[in-house]
Every structure is written in C-alpha cells, then in structure tokens.
C-alpha cells in the first residue's frame, strides 16, 4: 500500500512541495532565502497578531497603546521589538533573494518572477502602512509625505489624496484604515506566496551553473529541509540578538515623540530599507517625474526578463556581466546612503548620478554586455 503522504489529498500537496520535491543537487546557500522569507512572514504574522490584541488604532490612544504594550503587557517589549526588527530582516532576505534571482537568471521563469515583483510591492506597502501605526513624529510625517505623492497624478491627484486620507489631512480616518490594511495585506502576501510556489514547482529551481539539472536531482527532504533549518536557526539567532541587545538601532529617534501636525521633523526619511527608492524619488526636481522614477525603480524588475540578451542564463561564466551586477549592488548601497542624507551639496549630485546609473545599468549596460559576451563566444 502506498504511503499516506502520497495518497491523502492534502498531505499529497505538502509532500510534493516539501518532501519528494526534486531539487538540483548543487543549489547553494543563496537558494535558502525563499524559505527564510516564509519564516519571516510567519514570524511577522504571529508577532503582529499579538500586537494587534493590545493596539488601538485611534490617534488619541495609538502612541500610548504602543507604550502600554512595551511596559505592561507580558513580554510586550519583546514582541514589539521582534516585529519591528523582523521587518528589517524581511527586507534583508527579500533583497538578497532578488539579488540571487538577478545573478543566476532565475527571472527567466517569467510567471514566478513577476509574481515575486508583485510580492515585493505588497511587502513594501505593508511595511509603509505599518510604520504609520505607532503614530510617532516620523510615522505621521512619513505618511503625510508619501501619501502626498499621489497628488502628482494628473487631474485626479488631489481627489485621490483626500480619498486615501479620508479627510483633508492625515488624521484619525487615515490611521484606522492603515491599521486595517496592515492587518489584511500579510494574508494577501501569504496567498500570493502560494501562487509564487505553484509557478516555481511547474519548472523547478535553477542552479548556480545556469544549466539544466534534470540529470542530477535529489529529494528536498532530508537534504534541503535540514539546510533550511540551519538557515532558520541563523536568522532567528540574528533577529533575537538584535531585538534583545539593540532593538532601536535601525529605528528613528523622532518616532519616540508623539505625532504633532504643527512641528515638522528636521529630516523626514523612511526606514533604511526604503532609502534607495527615496533617494531616486528626491533626485528628480519634478514631483510627477520623481513619483514615476520611484515607481519605475521597482517595476524595472519586470523588464529584466525582456532585456536578457545573453545565450547563457546565469552570470557564473560571464565576468563582464558579473562586474555590472556588483556595480549595481554598490550603486544601490550608495543610493541607500544618499537617501538618509540631507538635501544639500554634494549629496544632491551624487544621488542624481547614482539614480541615473541605476536605470542605465538595467536598461542599457546589461543587454549590451550580454550581446558583447555572445559575440566573444563565437569561434572564428
């Protein structure tokens, strides 16, 4: 008689995804980040659920309720710290996961890749509305600045902003709906993750060579299930260490001050994981242009499969394209630094050069280099 896990309608799905899944024998640690993102999502939903039990989404009590969680709720300080820093680890994993996809040509699985980009947008939206909830100074002014960007939409801009706000400024209605969105989105993300995996399992994973690995597959369990568990342990140790030893390292001190519409903080800036996009937004002196650049800085990922000109999939055997990849990584690091700096010389011009280079690498240099490398492979 066949094993129950292979015949039971529900267990069969889990078995095909987690036990008997054929995986390439040579996938490296860079393939761990998908499962780590799943762990991050589960941890965020769990800690978020416990926070939501004690949080109140009203401007009169939101800030106090967060203070109450940290002071009076059993291990509330830990739950909040894990949730806030968990978001940072979520983005570390997501950026490494995308970097892996770009380096090894995973984007050629177009459905999986495009759903991944939609997932990135959903996670970014969730993080944004979540940052508003503690109702500190940076929460309030961050919400004001970013929602105001919608006013750049021609003709309907102002109506759109007031519709999002639920009034004529960021107020109680805004906070309440942002809490509703922040509660809802993670479950939408979980559903989209399932679709992401369904499309991935249609084709199977890529591998570091970029070659077809059908001839050399191993089962997911026990090999990669244990490899994933090691990743889980490392991530959780790192997260707990940060949450216990320096929980406010990545936060903004301005958010310890309750929101005040009459006092603008000297430097309005988002959390570190949005700084690269914020730098691109600020580097264009026109409002609509900046908003479009901000949007396109993420959506450009959807163009990557179209701009793939090389005969090889991965960058493993393509030194020139490898150089461009690391140039892009360095460029994003520079943008992240610039996003946290005040708008003054020389940061303005550095930001503008880095923003130009960001799009130039994706749209011009990568496809051209792919064609060049194809030419170099021709035997004469």
Curated annotation (Swiss-Prot):
Cofactor binding, note field: Binds 2 heme b groups non-covalently.
InterPro entries: Cyt_b/b6_C (IPR005798), Cyt_b/b6_C_sf (IPR036150), Cyt_b/b6_N (IPR005797), Cytb/b6-like_sf (IPR027387), Cytochrome_b (IPR030689), Cytochrome_b_C_euk/bac (IPR048260), Cytochrome_b_N_euk/bac (IPR048259), Di-haem_cyt_TM (IPR016174)
A Pfam short name: Cytochrome_B
Molecular function as annotated in GO: metal ion binding; ubiquinol-cytochrome-c reductase activity
Flavoprotein is among the record's keywords: no
Positions that bind heme b b566: 97, 196
Binding positions for heme b b562 per the UniProt entry: 83, 182
Membrane-topology annotation of the record: Multi-pass membrane protein
Amino-acid positions noted as binding a ubiquinone in the UniProt annotation, renumbered to this chain: 201
GO cellular component: mitochondrial inner membrane; respiratory chain complex III
Cofactor names: heme b
Entry's Gene Ontology BP terms: mitochondrial electron transport, ubiquinol to cytochrome c
Cellular compartments annotated: Mitochondrion inner membrane
Annotated function: Component of the ubiquinol-cytochrome c reductase complex (complex III or cytochrome b-c1 complex) that is part of the mitochondrial respiratory chain. The b-c1 complex mediates electron transfer from ubiquinol to cytochrome c. Contributes to the generation of a proton gradient across the mitochondrial membrane that is then used for ATP synthesis.
Self-association state and partner proteins as the record states: The cytochrome bc1 complex contains 3 respiratory subunits (MT-CYB, CYC1 and UQCRFS1), 2 core proteins (UQCRC1 and UQCRC2) and probably 6 low-molecular weight proteins.
Annotated family: Belongs to the cytochrome b family.
Protein's UniProt name: Cytochrome b
Species annotation: Astronotus ocellatus
Lineage: Eukaryota, Metazoa, Chordata, Craniata, Vertebrata
Gene from which this protein is expressed: mt-cyb
């Amino acid at each position: 008689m066949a094993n129950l896990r292979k015949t039971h309608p529900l267990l069969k799905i889990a078995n095909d995804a987690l036990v008997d899944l054929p995986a390439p024998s040579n996938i490296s640690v860079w393939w761990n980040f998908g499962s780590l993102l799943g762990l991050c999502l589960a941890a965020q939903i769990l800690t978020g659920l416990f926070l939501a039990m004690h949080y109140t989404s009203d401007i009169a009590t939101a800030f106090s309720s967060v203070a109450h969680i940290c002071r009076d709720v059993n291990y509330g300080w830990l739950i909040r710290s894990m949730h806030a820093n968990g978001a940072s680890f979520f983005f570390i994993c997501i950026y490494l996961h995308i970097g892996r996809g770009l380096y090894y040509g995973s984007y050629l699985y177009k459905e999986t890749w495009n759903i991944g980009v939609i997932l990135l947008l959903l996670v970014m939206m969730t993080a944004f509305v979540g940052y508003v909830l503690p109702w500190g100074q940076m929460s309030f002014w961050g919400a004001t600045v970013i929602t105001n960007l919608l006013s750049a939409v021609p003709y309907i801009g102002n109506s759109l902003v007031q519709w999002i706000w639920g009034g004529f400024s960021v107020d109680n209605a805004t906070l309440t709906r942002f809490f509703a969105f922040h509660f809802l989105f993670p479950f939408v993300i979980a559903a989209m993750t399932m679709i992401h995996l369904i499309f991935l399992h249609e084709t199977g994973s890529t591998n570091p060579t970029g070659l077809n690995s059908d001839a050399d597959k191993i089962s997911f369990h026990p090999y990669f299930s244990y490899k994933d568990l090691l990743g889980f342990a490392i991530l959780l140790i790192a997260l707990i260490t940060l949450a216990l030893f320096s929980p406010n390292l990545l936060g903004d001190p301005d958010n310890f001050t309750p929101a005040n519409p009459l006092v603008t903080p000297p430097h309005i800036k988002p959390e570190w994981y949005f700084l690269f996009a914020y730098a691109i937004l600020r580097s264009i002196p026109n409002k609509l242009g900046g908003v479009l650049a901000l949007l396109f800085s993420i959506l450009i990922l959807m163009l990557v499969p179209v701009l793939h000109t090389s005969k090889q999939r991965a960058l493993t055997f393509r030194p020139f394209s490898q150089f461009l990849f690391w140039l892009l990584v360095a460029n994003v690091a520079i943008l992240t630094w610039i996003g946290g700096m005040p708008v003054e010389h020389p940061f303005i011009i550095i930001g503008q050069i880095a923003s130009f280079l960001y799009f130039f690498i994706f749209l011009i240099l990568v496809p051209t280099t792919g064609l060049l490398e194809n030419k170099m492979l021709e035997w004469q």
